[in-house]
């Protein structure tokens, strides 16, 4: 249990550093889209790779729950949505639908890629 908590915490530290690196490199307007899109795709790939094994459970916790959980940012997405809702209701709805759709689609593609790579590796 303690090792699992440590894996999530250490992954969270790495993910936070990664997001900070993107924050200082990319304009604020596109930051959330890039972070959540890349993070969702990576989450899908990793979940695909880890889908049929519990052998690397701590690595999965480190990479998915910890690192990518800290890298992506649902709270900032929610705050941005609320700010848009104050004056631009239609724009806020479009923003929420597009962000959610983008992340789900990228996570799905990532998962298919990850599970496909895993199956290809098992055949070799």
What is each model feature region?
Residues 1-124:
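Membrane-interface helix-loop junctions in multi-pass transporters/channels
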């Amino acid at each position: 249990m303690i090792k699992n908590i440590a894996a999530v915490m250490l992954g969270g530290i790495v993910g936070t550093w990664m997001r900070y690196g993107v924050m200082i490199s990319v304009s604020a307007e596109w930051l959330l889209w890039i972070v959540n899109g890349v993070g969702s795709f990576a989450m899908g790939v990793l979940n695909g790779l880890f889908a049929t094994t519990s052998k690397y459970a701590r690595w999965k916790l480190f990479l998915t729950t910890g690192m990518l959980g800290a890298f992506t940012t649902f709270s900032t997405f929610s705050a941005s949505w609320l700010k848009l809702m104050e004056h631009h209701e239609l724009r806020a709805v479009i923003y929420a639908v597009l962000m959610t759709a983008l992340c789900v689609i990228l996570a799905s593609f990532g998962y298919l890629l990850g599970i496909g790579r895993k199956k290809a590796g098992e055949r070799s």
